[in-house]
């Protein structure tokens, strides 16, 4: 159903309510009984003869009927207390909102500001004076575990390196296990069946495993300390493959209301993170509305807003303006920033011979700035300062691929890989500063060139999580690039990519609407799940097997509901067989009642089950374990062999002679 908010504040309406035959459930980790980790339970029909199936859920409170949704107030903020309990942070006034933050929009076009204001948190630069900052019962807060001579820890990476398991780590471990007590035998069998290309997927995810993966830099929990509404999730190749959905307004279309609706719509269908790529008016306000209503991590490309602040002219960009934009967005609670610090002056000429040049918006902005000033990129020269700033808020890096190929003709060229090598250098700097890092990747890459991208990224970037846009495997299908890219996404996900950025049917053609968002999300959920199956993820195949059993047993409603998109599955079925009676029929409109292979198979099974021992034995080949009547089969085979020789040992025989021979045998 839709809940419409107060029209005097905003006209936003978002989709709420459970998916068909599903309910929101919560798991409680043994080590943190105060946590409630969300899952979606798919309720199977009474005749299924098997338990309901819990699945990963990204939809937040919007599918919980016990929660009253009011987009004007935003979601609850339980994570804020987790952060404060760890210590090492301070609450402060924050910067004032400036006219340029919203593109100097006039009053006639200004969006309504979000009503609730939360003072931001930031990490302390140094420990508090001795005797201050103690935790509950006088205990030292976790942030100060390195001692009084060291600055407090703020980021998940710093806690992990110190050996401290945070609530976020406990939360994501429970989430990755889907709330089930693992059946290790089945899990190990699934792992043995898959090909993980060096990934170390365990049979059971523990908080300690999560901590270790983050400490090694192989995984991140994007979780700004100011995003209190967040339900933590993890990105890494040894976990479930995640997907991102892009939303955002532009200078010519969309509104705040539409973008909030698209965010809720995207997470309903399975988006693990959402990027707000707004480039038009009301950027700050749009982002605030999205963040305050988002249970998933939100990413941005700060250079887009910085460009709006200087009238859209890349030449006018400055480090000071960009730094102010980073602070603005970090205070709001953005969880990860795409920063194109690998676009260096010396690499730009490498793109001159490309078919499609520089296709990244952020990459082209920085390339123009570098050429106009004939200087090294300020993102590169000020990278240490960027790290210090992002660490204060635990904003994760998503190091952008500003020189990614925009056509398969440009795939894997020197410009692309030169930037990737620089991103590897920057990753090590960010880690040394205590920041979490993932790496962005292409783009447009034909199938035979995909694996080298994954292998080179792992080598150059120390196994930091890879996050790719597709890649698109061919350039000939405008309007269908969700398919051309879904092929590449499934492949690179199998090879080890941790998160896949969706592509919608509108790619290269226009701004996606909510229908395009759903199509993109479902397409990429398929790709991510296919990758998890191929890697041998221990829980991945449970849903496939449940749906296959429902299909074979003609449990149509279970078949719809176990799918990624129950609404579309049932709509297609009902186009030709709409009646309730058809939901229990043992056929569909493809084959009809007489030619359904599964119905025929069921009839054969039923027939075999009713046979006596002698009749069953006749169905088995010689020596088969099912043959229980000694000599019966051997005698029959010997008789038929003699008959074959008697008839002339020919494959094709005269019909009349065969009839006469059969009479003699009877």
UniProtKB/Swiss-Prot annotation:
Binding site for substrate: 246, 275, 304, 340, 360-362, 401-404, 440, 467
Annotated pathway: Cofactor biosynthesis; thiamine diphosphate biosynthesis
Any one Gene Ontology BP term: thiamine diphosphate biosynthetic process
Catalytic activity, EC: 4.1.99.17
GO cellular component terms attached to this protein's record: cytosol
Catalytic activity: 5-amino-1-(5-phospho-beta-D-ribosyl)imidazole + S-adenosyl-L-methionine = 4-amino-2-methyl-5-(phosphooxymethyl)pyrimidine + CO + 5'-deoxyadenosine + formate + L-methionine + 3 H(+)
Residues engaged in binding Zn(2+): 444, 508
Cofactor(s), by name: [4Fe-4S] cluster
Ranges annotated as spanning the membrane: none
A Pfam family it matches: ThiC_Rad_SAM
Domain of life: Bacteria
Residues the record lists as binding [4Fe-4S] cluster: 588, 591, 596
Keyword 4Fe-4S among record annotations: yes
Keyword annotations: 4Fe-4S, Iron, Iron-sulfur, Lyase, Metal-binding, S-adenosyl-L-methionine, Thiamine biosynthesis, Zinc
One MF term in the entry's GO annotations: carbon-carbon lyase activity
Cofactor binding notes: Binds 1 [4Fe-4S] cluster per subunit. The cluster is coordinated with 3 cysteines and an exchangeable S-adenosyl-L-methionine.
Family: Belongs to the ThiC family.
Oligomer status and interactors: Homodimer.
NCBIfam families: PRK09284.1 (NF006763), PRK13352.1 (NF009895), thiC (TIGR00190)
Role: Catalyzes the synthesis of the hydroxymethylpyrimidine phosphate (HMP-P) moiety of thiamine from aminoimidazole ribotide (AIR) in a radical S-adenosyl-L-methionine (SAM)-dependent reaction.
Name of the molecule in the record: Phosphomethylpyrimidine synthase
Organism: Rhodopseudomonas palustris (strain ATCC BAA-98 / CGA009)
Gene: thiC
